[in-house]
């Protein structure tokens, strides 16, 4: 019995030893903490000594003004803050160029093709950032695309810079075609069939009427004033007929946040109708493009244009239904795979349609494919749109920079510029009047009709995307006369962006708060804010 008791006592002592070891370590830490809490002389701190120590610390580290802190941060070693960010960004830019140079050699040196593309890309980004910094009170910010466009324009027309930054036409055309594919995918995914059903008549009228009338007006003016053939006149008309979502949508969102026109759904109407307006313009342009470069009788050209539309729609239906189900929803990285497929198929459609002699079918195929894919994806459509938006952030500076770089001042005749401005001005006035008529009998008052008419003015994105397509196609055919027609179309597109984008943005910002009714909820919030300020 005694042996059993000893064994039991021994077993009980084992865990107690562990507990004692833990307790001793805890006590050790407590002692260390206590030693740390003691003063230098080893005495325990009292309330008076704590106050004394705090005063000594405050006297030892006086508070510095903000400007001294900023200077200390700037002159710190190693650098921090803004200086550190600048050094990091410059290093990344130089590293990108150095990596490309190590692979391509002379192509990435001044005068080389890749050097020109990289420099144009950087300059366009800087130009867009600078324009984005221009902010006027109570007005929407100026669209950064203007800075990108002007950056490309300056690169081409400043002698010293243009000698060292040169881009081959083939590369420029290919990059613009890829950017066009990205725009078409975004337009197709952004189509909202439910919004069209809700707004019905007024949305359809606003999408079709101004675009078609402006296209016809521009075609007549281009034929009689500029001497363009009818097919080229209608191409120019559909280039001008599209409204710019890059200008209209941000401005509408600002008004919507302020509660202007929300009760009658004016911001929603303009954003929804803008997508259909752009698709109509792009489809009409592609159809006229195919007819303009067809050889044969007029009847044959018309039939070929209809055939291109049919080919584009049918191919888009097939591809759209395919990527609705592949990749399947149980796969990993589903969003990235879907974004890659829709972008890859769109780029392939645009390039292959030109290769097979049906240039008008590629854009329509892309629109139908993206629209059907978006309807099938429903739950992940928004995530795919975010990935496509990243691709657009990359190709937007290239697109607008390359468009600006295509315009050479010395190659333009003064009378050509005058005729282009006259054609643009008359077409825009007709568009404003037609837009006013299209929104009649839709429940809007006179002020709201005037606002919608001027809000339907800005042009930018679609003009940059398709404005140079005719010129690129003419260059591929090697006909100087057709290249001249293409240059006229591009010049009008360039002028339309430079003139209407900033003017339209400013008009929306100025007229919106003055002509649109404000929602009651926003009025109550403002009244409460004013009352609290008075109190």
From Swiss-Prot:
Residues 1-85, 133-143, 189-199, 242-269, 324-338, 373-389, 440-460, 509-535 are cytoplasmic. It is found in: Cell membrane; Mitochondrion membrane; Endosome membrane; Recycling endosome membrane. The chain crosses the membrane at residues 86-103, 113-132, 144-160, 171-188, 200-226, 233-241, 270-289, 300-323, 339-356, 361-372, 390-410, 417-439, 461-472, 486-508. Residues 1-70 are annotated as: Disordered. Its main location: membrane. The keyword Membrane applies. GO terms for biological process: clathrin-dependent endocytosis; flagellated sperm motility; lithium ion transport; positive regulation of osteoclast development; regulation of insulin secretion involved in cellular response to glucose stimulus; sodium ion homeostasis; sodium ion transport. Residues 104-112, 161-170, 227-232, 290-299, 357-360, 411-416, 473-485 are extracellular. Allosterically inhibited by the N-terminal domain. Inhibited by phloretin. It is a multi-pass membrane protein. GO terms for cellular component: apical plasma membrane; basolateral plasma membrane; endosome membrane; lysosomal membrane; mitochondrial membrane; plasma membrane; recycling endosome; recycling endosome membrane. Residues 1-14 have a biased composition (Basic and acidic residues). It comes from the Eukaryota. It catalyses: Li(+)(out) + H(+)(in) = Li(+)(in) + H(+)(out); Li(+)(in) + Na(+)(out) = Li(+)(out) + Na(+)(in); Na(+)(in) + H(+)(out) = Na(+)(out) + H(+)(in). Residues 16-34, 46-58 have a biased composition (Polar residues). Keywords: Cell membrane, Cell projection, Cilium, Cytoplasmic vesicle, Endosome, Flagellum, Lysosome, Membrane, Metal-binding, Mitochondrion, Sodium, Synapse, Transmembrane, Transmembrane helix. Gene3D superfamilies: 1.20.1530.20. Na(+) binds at residues 243, 274, 277-278. Pfam families: Na_H_Exchanger (PF00999). GO terms for molecular function: identical protein binding; lithium:proton antiporter activity; metal ion binding; sodium:proton antiporter activity. Electroneutral Na(+) Li(+)/H(+) antiporter that extrudes Na(+) or Li(+) in exchange for external protons across the membrane. Uses the proton gradient/membrane potential to extrude sodium. Contributes to the regulation of intracellular pH and sodium homeostasis. Also able to mediate Na(+)/Li(+) antiporter activity in kidney. May play a physiological role in renal tubular function and blood pressure homeostasis. Plays an important role for insulin secretion and clathrin-mediated endocytosis in beta-cells. Involved in sperm motility and fertility. The subcellular localization of SLC9B2 remains controversial. Was initially thought to partially localize to mitochondria. However SLC9B2 does not seem to contain a mitochondrial targeting sequence. It was later established that its localizes predominantly in plasma membrane or intracellularly to endosomes and lysosomes. In another recent study, endogenous SLC9B2 in the distal tubular cell line mpkDCT4 is detected in recycling endosomes but absent in plasma membrane. Homodimer; dimerization is essential for SLC9B2 activity. Lipids seem to play a role in the stabilization of the dimerization subdomain. PANTHER family: PTHR31102, SODIUM_HYDROGEN EXCHANGER 9B2. Belongs to the monovalent cation:proton antiporter 1 (CPA1) transporter (TC 2.A.36) family. This is Sodium/hydrogen exchanger 9B2.
């Amino acid at each position: 019995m005694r042996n059993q008791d000893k064994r039991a006592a021994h077993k009980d002592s084992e865990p107690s030893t562990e507990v004692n070891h833990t307790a001793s370590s805890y006590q050790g830490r407590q002692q260390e903490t206590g030693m740390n809490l003691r003063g230098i002389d080893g005495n325990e701190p009292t309330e008076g000594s704590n106050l004394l120590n705090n005063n000594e610390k405050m006297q030892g580290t006086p508070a510095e003004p903000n400007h001294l802190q900023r200077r200390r941060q700037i002159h710190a070693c190693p650098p921090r803050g803004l200086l550190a960010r600048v050094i990091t960004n410059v290093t990344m830019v130089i590293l990108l160029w150095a990596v490309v140079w190590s692979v391509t050699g002379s192509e990435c040196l001044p005068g080389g093709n890749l050097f020109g593309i990289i420099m144009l890309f950087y300059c366009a980004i800087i130009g867009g950032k600078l324009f984005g910094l221009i902010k006027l009170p109570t007005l929407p910010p100026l669209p950064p695309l203007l800075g990108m466009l002007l950056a490309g324009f300056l690169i081409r027309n400043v002698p010293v810079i243009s000698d060292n930054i040169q881009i081959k036409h083939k590369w420029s055309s290919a990059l613009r075609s890829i950017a066009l594919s990205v725009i078409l995918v975004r337009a197709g995914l952004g189509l909202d069939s439910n919004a069209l059903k809700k707004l019905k008549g007024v949305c359809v009228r606003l999408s079709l009427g101004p675009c078609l009338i402006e296209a016809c007006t521009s075609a007549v003016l281009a034929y009689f004033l500029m001497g363009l053939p009818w097919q080229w006149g209608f191409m120019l008309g559909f280039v001008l007929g599209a409204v710019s979502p890059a200008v209209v949508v941000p401005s509408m969102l600002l008004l919507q946040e302020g509660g202007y026109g929300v009760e009658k759904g004016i911001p929603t109407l303009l954003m929804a109708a803008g997508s259909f307006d752009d698709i109509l313009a792009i489809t009409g342009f592609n159809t006229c493009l195919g007819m303009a470069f067809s050889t044969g009788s007029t009847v044959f050209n018309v039939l070929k244009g209809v055939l291109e539309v049919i080919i584009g729609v049918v191919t888009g239906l097939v591809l759209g239904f395919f990527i609705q189900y592949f990749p399947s929803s149980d796969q990993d990285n589903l969003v990235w795979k879907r974004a890659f497929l829709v972008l890859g198929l769109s780029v392939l459609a645009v390039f292959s349609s030109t290769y097979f002699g049906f240039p008008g079918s590629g854009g329509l195929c892309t629109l139908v494919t993206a629209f059907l894919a978006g309807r099938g994806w429903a739950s992940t459509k928004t995530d795919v749109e975010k990935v496509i938006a990243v691709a657009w952030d990359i190709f937007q500076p290239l697109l607008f920079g390359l468009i600006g770089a295509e315009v050479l001042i010395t190659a333009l005749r003064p009378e050509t510029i005058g005729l282009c401005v006259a054609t643009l001005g008359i077409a825009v006035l007709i568009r404003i009047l037609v837009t006013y008529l299209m929104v009649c009998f839709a429940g809007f008052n006179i002020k709201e009709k005037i606002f919608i008419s001027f809000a339907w003015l800005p042009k930018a994105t679609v003009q940059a995307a398709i404005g140079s397509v005719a010129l690129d196609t003419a260059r591929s055919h090697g006909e100087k006369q057709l290249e001249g027609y293409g240059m006229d179309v591009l010049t009008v597109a360039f002028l339309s962006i430079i003139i209407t984008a900033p003017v339209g943005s400013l008009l929306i910002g100025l007229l919106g708060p003055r002509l649109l009714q404000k929602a009651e909820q926003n009025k109550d919030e403002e009244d409460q804010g004013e009352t609290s300020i008075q109190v």
